[in-house]
Amino acid sequence: DKFIGNAYRLEYGISMDKLHRGSNFGRIILETPYETLSYEVVVEKDICRDEEHRANEKEFNGILKDYLKYEGDKMSLEDWTEASIKKISHLREGDERNEFYLLAQAHICILGNRMDEAKWLLESYNYNRFAIGKDVELSSYYLYLTTKLSNDSIGQRRVAEELSRSFMKHPDSWRILCMLIEVDSEYKIYSERLNVLEKQFMEYKSHSLWFYLQAFRCFKEKSSSLKKLGQFEVQVLLFGVKYKLMTKELALYTANLASQMKNFDKHLYNVLVKCYEMYDEAMILTSI
């Protein structure tokens, strides 16, 4: 009633419990005897900007790439564990409700032989077996990690069965597959493991670091498991030379197989060149 002038500061309240995730659009309408004014209002909740998402993804990928340094004897396990816990803790601080980061921290602790910390983290995860369908990869990740903390063969078999059922329902999930082949005794045989990984690669073009690492480990641990040099095998070997994981034995074995090839393969050629840079061997040079 006492207002005079052409500007007024109007305060309004927003009930946070009525907001949904993302952008919430609203309108404030002011009616006077002379006119009706309308103001658009946008309230954002739990918005993850593209820049923020890319930054988080880069930081998490840094954890994986550093682990490859450890795999290639370029970094100690202790140093990797310390650095990775700092990175994942930073990610969790920025997104406290992200349960994947919680499980990833538990995984890092397991790999770093910090079992008590890993156990505490897993106990804080709110797992509900009846809600596994809501986020099957996250629930599968939790189950997979529990097998790393226990030697209970019956429990591990049950987890393997659960992961197998989940993978049958979601055959495009390379994450569930990578967990399954570590837990299910059926895939202890390298040929079985490589067959299912190759099928995943050919059908769904899986190309994550962890996926390639699972396949490369087979060749690294048993060179004779490399039976041919098809598209899948060459891509896995490219991964190996890129991150300097190639052993001398596997490099020579690859060169021997390559020398029997009748057609030129540019990607295989690049593998051999990288192998020769790592191991100055006549057999590799001849194959090139």
Feature names for model-found ranges:
Residues 1-11, 124-129, 138-144:
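Surface-exposed binding patches on compact interaction domains or structured appendages
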Residues 10-14, 21-34:
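A short beta-strand micro-motif common to beta-rich folds, especially ectodomain repeats
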Residues 40-71:
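Low-complexity, Pro/Ser/Thr- and charge-rich linker/hinge segments at domain boundaries
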Residues 57-63, 79-91, 115-128, 152-167, ...:
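Alpha-helical repeat scaffolds
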Residues 68, 75-79:
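Long, compositionally biased charged/polar accessory segments in the mid-to-C-terminal portions
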Residues 80-81, 91-98, 105, 131-136, ...:
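Residues that mark the junctions of alpha-helical repeat units in TPR/alpha-solenoid scaffolds
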Residues 102, 139-140, 177, 212, ...:
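TPR repeat positional signature
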Residues 107-111, 142-149, 180-183, 217-218:
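Residue-level signature for tetratricopeptide repeat
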